[in-house]
Regions:
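Terminal targeting signals and extreme-terminal segments of soluble enzymes
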Residues: 1-136
Length: 136
């Protein structure tokens, strides 16, 4: 297996997408086991009625984190095939950290597990993504 991509190799890909720029996500950490992405607090992402982050935002960044965990290992586009999210508790105002770990690197499909947590480490959602890792 090739070496894991470095922060310097991943960051331009992550931040070069206009949608990612809108979200404000930042690469927090990259290592051989995982990728961590920070979603800074943005009041636009929270419901006005109860002050919790919208589940669609959580799902979106879970997907992005899983993608980059697999991408960091394969250095090729890995489109999402399937995504499962379990919402554990309401995400209150504040930054969130999304840590994705590769469970399996396959010839056709790879799997990543993702934890979305507040800055105290309390998980607000977990996800599992399946990503197409087929070589073209």
């Amino acid at each position: 297996m090739a070496a894991v991509l470095t922060r310097e190799e991943i960051e331009p890909v992550l931040t070069g997408t206009k949608f990612h720029q809108f979200l404000g996500i930042r690469l927090e950490e990259v290592n051989e086991q995982s990728v961590t992405i920070r979603l800074p607090y943005n009041e636009l992402f929270y419901t006005s009625a109860d002050g919790y982050i919208h589940g669609g935002i959580l799902a979106t960044v879970i997907d992005i984190a899983g993608y980059f965990a697999v991408f960091s290992q394969l250095n090729q586009p890995v489109p999402t095939v399937d995504l499962k999210i379990d919402y554990l508790r309401p995400g209150r105002a504040g930054d969130l950290l999304f840590t994705a770990s590769v469970v399996k690197l396959g010839r056709s499909v790879s799997i990543a597990d993702i934890v979305a947590a507040d800055t105290s480490g309390k998980a607000v959602a977990i996800g599992r993504g399946l990503f197409s890792s087929k070589q073209e």
